[in-house]
Amino acid sequence: MRVNSSAARSMKFLTDLLLSRSYWLTLAVVSAAMMATALYYQYVLGEEPCQVCIQARLWLVGFMLVATVMALLPNTRLLRSVGNGLALVCAVGLVERSWFLYQLENGMGDGSCEFQLGMPDWFAVDRWFPALFEVRNLCSFTPDMLFGLSMAESLLLAATGMVLAVLGSLAATRYTTASAGS
């Protein structure tokens, strides 16, 4: 009986955490740290970004904006569901771009990249914010980061973690709804 009580307390703590503003704030801070790392590699270490890297940055900025807005909005089930849905789309987009970059880097992919971002004229972020979104290199390899992982591998791991965090929040939302109904 004691194990069930302990498990229930742990589940409640995890659920409360995943439904809190702190969760969204943490996701926003992690996203900002990832962007700061990319800019450090670009401007301090001289590692210029390619088309796929910039597309990954766009997904990351989308995720960061969703997380920031969700941290500021009232915590209602509807808004939480919409926010989690948007965050999931951004995180999955980031995983896809990371996987594509990983494949290119390791000679597994069947693709390449260009010196243009490839966005329509009405969404010319590379012209509006060239310091953040201008393509300056062709895809080939990404620099090494911590633990001998390449930037593509690190990004793939981080993006997968983001997807799991959002899925956890969605599960927590469903869990609280099911608990309230019973």
Which residues does each PLM region occupy?
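Short, charged juxtamembrane terminal tails flanking transmembrane helices
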Residues: 3, 12, 176-182
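Extracytosolic (periplasmic/ER-lumenal) interhelical loops and adjacent juxtamembrane/interface segments
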Residues: 105-152
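Membrane-interface loop-to-helix entry segments
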Residues: 52-62, 129-133, 146-161
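Structural signal for the C-terminal ends of transmembrane alpha-helices
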Residues: 68-76, 164-174
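C-terminal TM-helix exit segments that contain a strictly Trp-centered aromatic cap at the helix terminus
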Residues: 33-42, 92-108, 125
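Non-cytosolic membrane-interface motifs at loop->transmembrane helix junctions
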Residues: 47-57, 83, 112-114
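Interfacial segments of alpha-helical transmembrane regions
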Residues: 16-29, 75-95, 164
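Short, Lys/Arg-rich, polar N-terminal cytosolic tail immediately upstream
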Residues: 2-19
